[in-house]
Curated annotation (Swiss-Prot):
This is Small heat shock protein hspK. One of its GO terms (molecular function) is unfolded protein binding. The keyword Transcription does not apply. Residues 87-114 have a biased composition (Low complexity). PROSITE patterns: SHSP.
């Protein structure tokens, strides 16, 4: 059986692993649970500017903060808040019972999977990502942070970082006469 490579599926797998890693790291250092997630990001670098686009569906502008630190680092933070008690839904790792039998004569395996009956008026799992996020990017040397622009439209946050005009390695200085 041949399986085609799906970059979106692979990105989601990596995203999920990173979220689990972040959650374990933070949970082990504190007594309370903090949801941290990493929004999908697209970075484009061209001659005149760098464009960073975040996919932030369900987050308003006032739930996002964009700052530049003294170390010339762009820091983007925000929080996607729950609506209607989404924090209390069971996670996607709900218990599922599985029985497997193998027929050695034909080398086939039959697996029967049964899920526990769902409670009335309850959803089976929470697939909506909520919680806080933080992303940071080291800006190129010579970046004028006052010229950085950010816009948000239809759940997409776009940050435009203008590049400093490239200077030549050597600058020719003309010699003028005193007259």
């Amino acid at each position: 059986m041949t399986m085609e490579f799906d970059p979106r599926r692979e990105r989601r797998k990596v995203q999920k692993k990173m979220n689990v890693f972040d959650h374990r790291l933070i949970s082990s250092n504190s007594n309370h649970r903090i949801n941290i997630w990493r929004p999908t990001v697209s970075i484009k670098d061209n001659k005149t500017h760098i464009s960073i686009i975040f996919e932030l569906a369900g987050i308003s502008r006032d739930q996002i903060s964009i700052e530049v630190t003294k170390e010339n680092t762009l820091v983007i933070t925000g929080e996607k808040k729950s609506k209607g008690g989404l924090n209390n839904l069971p996670s996607s790792s709900s218990s599922i019972n599985s029985d497997s039998t193998t027929n050695t004569n034909t080398n086939t395996t039959t697996t029967t999977t049964t899920a526990p009956p769902p409670p009335s008026d309850a959803q089976l799992k929470n697939i909506i990502t909520i919680g806080k996020f933080i992303r940071s990017y080291k800006l190129p040397p010579g970046t004028d942070s006052s010229k950085i622009k950010a816009t948000m439209d239809d759940g997409l946050l776009e940050i435009i970082i203008p590049k400093d005009t490239p200077s030549e390695d050597r600058l020719k200085i003309p010699i003028q006469s005193k007259l």
